[in-house]
Amino acid sequence: MAEKSSFFVHFSCLLLLLTIIITCGEGVRNPVRPRSSERRALMDGQDLSRPLKLTFGGPSRNWTDAIPIGNGRLGATIWGGVSSEILNINEDTIWTGVPADYTNQKAPEALAEVRRLVDERNYAEATSEAVKLSGQPSDVYQIVGDLNLEFDSSHRKYTQASYRRELDLETAVAKVSYSVGAVDFSREFFASNPDQVIIAKIYASKPGSLSFKVSFDSELHHHSETNPKANQILMRGSCRPKRLPVNLKKSINATNIPYDDHKGLQFASILEVRVSNGGSVSSLGGKKLSVEKADWAVLLLAASSNFDGPFTMPVDSKIDPAKECVNRISSVQKYSYSDLYARHLGDYQKLFNRVSLHLSGSSTNETVQQATSTAERVRSFKTDQDPSLVELLFQYGRYLLISSSRPGTQVANLQGIWNRDIQPPWDGAPHLNINLQMNYWHSLPGNIRECQEPLFDYMSALAINGRKTAQVNYGASGWVAHQVSDIWAKTSPDRGEAVWALWPMGGAWLCTHAWEHYTYTMDKEFLKKKGYPLLEGCTSFLLDWLIKGKDGFLQTNPSTSPEHMFTAPIGKPASVSYSSTMDIAIIKEVFADIVSASEILGKTNDTLIGKVIAAQAKLPPTRISKDGSIREWAEDFEDPEVHHRHVSHLFGLFPGHTITVEKSPELAKAVEATLKKRGEEGPGWSTTWKAALWARLHNSEHAYRMVTHIFDLVDPLNERNYEGGLYSNMFTAHPPFQIDANFGFAAAVAEMLVQSTTKDLYLLPALPADKWPNGIVNGLRARGGVTVSIKWMEGNLVEFGLWSEQIVSTRIVYRGISAAAELLPGKVFTFDKDLRCIRTDKL
């Protein structure tokens, strides 16, 4: 990008009205959402205080209509029925299986044969032989069960026009309301992170009008009983110690297949009911509680398992899940409902309020927005292209990660934490060839870095099992992880065909997140204690995995491009060859990351770093096919599926950094050709990945086109595989539901507005000025530990603000104009459209 002007800035400024500073518990200052009055002032009188709410005009008919809530560990989906209400309850450690050794003692022999066949360019036979490297399937994410509420028959006569159901993203509270005659009934639900319980309040406008029954149920082995003295129901249950068969026919009722109750994970859930004075609670048949003639009732739900880490057999666990639940319920006895709500709100908003986004460009009336269900708004997006719906989906991604991944929890899996099946699609397992990584793409730019902590805990567990897999399967040092994992930190290849199972780059891709975490936070202690050890072990494996090829370059052999076949020279389908473009791109990224990390930590003289630097010079370049696109494989094979959903060979552009518009324009041009060749259709996660790729190319038109593709309302009873879209609760569709695209969408929108390296900051690099002509984004994070706020009008930058927790030297770039700036801690900078500092103040 041409440099038209440059100047050095060494003072700090206050970003007036865009940035408010709060102090978090750890002492870090963070910008929060501006008050609505300030938002109005910033947009010259335009009211930007649109509610961030998902709204529904009736009860759920399908699970993908239900409202998700969560506190990172506990989750629920709320159906919002009138005469009966269902909450599907999830707890993030409810899984099948036990710790197991899935290493393959016969793998080294098979590996040698596969490599021989690849060397002979017999790729079809190598693909067949590579099945011998496959292993056992992962275990399966389960559901605790359902909480059922049955209201008296009068509720069936509710006034349909009075019904409203909503999820407020600013408070993380779900609400259901309706009227029966002259009585208004309301329910509120939230999942408290500070108190580790799910809380509901149900109330009626007329005293004594609230009566209902409540009970537990589960498809897993379970037993429930009431404790009338404490107004409680306790459910105990157990998970299967071994997953159901992979190919179990759908016609078979899985709940009837017996299993050993004692070997798998044990779980418990407790519900306690509080009622107003004058109301009563009694036991029905020892299984249900009955509430009669109350003004209001508060439900407190706790759930837990005896999971004690991925290396402890459930039978050896010292954790009593029922006792855990009792303790959690007991710990909140001192709090009123208002207290519980305030504690929840303070915890949640500390994270959520760090970023706000306001886009204008639509004539959609505010009143119409509030009266129209979210599903109808999605349906009409193709015609009105309402930017407030983009705001909503962006913030929904942040809401969902805050709700499904918190310090100390498990990672957000393929469905976050929300699941209603004992056989969920793709086992609900973490998939490491795009899906798990995409879950966390927006955690750093979206300014919720704490939510990424479970990923590094998980990687530490993978590193332990991965050392066994690397040593036994491949005779290599370090650690490795493949395509699919589970709560037991499985690292060996999955079952089945090599096209998906044989992919030893899952751990390496995850390791790039460790370096990214450092670049966004500049947390040297994290890098030293957690990030670098993970990179070190991964790098050791990669160095051993690389072998010298006939062309003199180091190569990976065998190698696949995730889930994609090619046509071998003999005309047969194959997936196994050598040095797929993604393999090499990930290795280049990891090697660059560990070299950079070694410089920060003073480890440049380590033997490992010397080996890495020597290997870097021997890695093959990214190659361009004869049609001008990026090659997916080392050879220019015929691609039988040019519109394949994966775009793995473009990793080097995004989320990687080895291809850039500025430094490698020829490769960037080839990436553009590749994206056009691949096409725009695909599942949700593919769509959002392509949006981020186009944004990295600074192509606002195509980035926005991919954004619009996500707004396609999906009928869960008539799904079309691989076509993406949104369900009515704004869960993203593969179909079926996968949560990755919810997170990928937030990352892609952030990428359209701000891009960065540790030395460069690009403002509005892919802004669709004709679609979002006016806007404010507040609180996005950039590499270098910089927080960014931007205001633009009529498609042009007006002003922006920067602040950092440490000294940062950066180059600010906007439309070819660049300026050098040095940010000082405790200061905030405000710049105008010409990148000149216009105001200054201390924090």
Swiss-Prot record:
Organism taxonomic ancestry: Eukaryota, Viridiplantae, Streptophyta, Embryophyta, Tracheophyta
Expressing tissues: Ubiquitous. Highest expression in vascular tissues, leaf trichomes, root elongation zone and emerging lateral roots.
Signal peptide start and end residues: 1-27
Sample GO molecular function, one term: 1,2-alpha-L-fucosidase activity
Organism: Arabidopsis thaliana
EC number(s) on file: 3.2.1.51
BP GO annotations: carbohydrate metabolic process
Residues that carry a glycan: 62, 253, 365, 605
Subcellular location: Secreted, Extracellular space, Apoplast
GO cellular component annotations of the record: apoplast
Pfam families: Glyco_hyd_65N_2, Glyco_hydro_95_C, Glyco_hydro_95_cat
Effect of residue 511 to Y: In axy8-4; Loss of activity
Gene3D superfamilies with a match to the protein in the record: 1.50.10.10
Protein family: Belongs to the glycosyl hydrolase 95 family.
Keyword entries, A-Z: Apoplast, Glycoprotein, Glycosidase, Hydrolase, Secreted, Signal
Protein name, per record: Alpha-L-fucosidase 2
pH dependence: Optimum pH is 5.0.
Disruption phenotype: No visible phenotype. Higher abundance of fucosylated oligosaccharides and presence of unusual oligosaccharides.
Function: Hydrolyzes alpha-1,2-linked fucose. Also active on fucosylated xyloglucan oligosaccharides. No activity with 3-fucosyllactose, p-nitrophenyl-alpha-I-fucopyranoside, lacto-N-fucopentaose II, lacto-N-fucopentaose III or alpha 1,6-fucosylated chitopentaose. Involved in apoplastic xyloglucan metabolism.
Recorded catalytic activity of this chain's protein: an alpha-L-fucoside + H2O = L-fucose + an alcohol
